[in-house]
Amino acid sequence: MELNGIKPSLGAKHAKRRVGRGIGSGLGKTAGRGHKGQKSRAGGYHKVGFEGGQMPMQRRLPKRGFKSHLLKFNAEVTLSALEQLGLAEVDLLALKTAGLVGQLAKNVKVIKSGELSKAVKLNGISATAGAKAIIEAAGGSVA
C-alpha cells in the first residue's frame, strides 16, 4: 500500500446534489422545494422567532430583573488557592499573573473554602467573614 494509491471505498463518497437541472435528474422544475408558498420562493425565509405575525413567544412571556454587566469584573479566590500560591503578600496583580482571576477582574474576594496554614497579607482584596477569621488565625491580615 502506498499513500498515492489510497482511495475511499466504493459508495463512501456521493456526488453533490445539483438541483434544477432538468427532469431526468429527478430534481428539476421545483428543485425539491414543492409548489408555491414562502419557502419555495427566492429571497430566503423568515427570521428566527418570527411566528407569521402572531405575537412571538419571546414577547408573550413576562420578563423580570436584569443580568448585571458588572459581574464580569468580580472574581472569587479560595483559601486553598492562596495556600498553593505560596506568596506572603497577595494583591490583584499577583492573582492576575498567577492566572487565578481573569484579566478583566477589578474586585476580588477571598472565600472560605479549604485550609490556610501560612500567614498571608491581602492588599486591596476583600474577604468573607469566615475567610478573614482563618487568615488572621494563621497570622495574616486583610488590608
UniProtKB/Swiss-Prot annotation:
Keyword RNA-binding: yes
Entry keyword annotation includes Nucleotide-binding: no
Keywords of this entry: Ribonucleoprotein, Ribosomal protein, RNA-binding, rRNA-binding
UniProt xrefs under Gene3D superfamilies: 3.100.10.10
Stretches with biased composition (Gly residues): 21-31
Quaternary structure and partners: Part of the 50S ribosomal subunit.
Described function: Binds to the 23S rRNA.
PANTHER family linked: 50S RIBOSOMAL PROTEIN L15 (PTHR12934), LARGE RIBOSOMAL SUBUNIT PROTEIN UL15M (PTHR12934:SF11)
Protein name: Large ribosomal subunit protein uL15
Lineage: Bacteria, Pseudomonadati, Pseudomonadota, Betaproteobacteria, Burkholderiales
Underlying gene: rplO
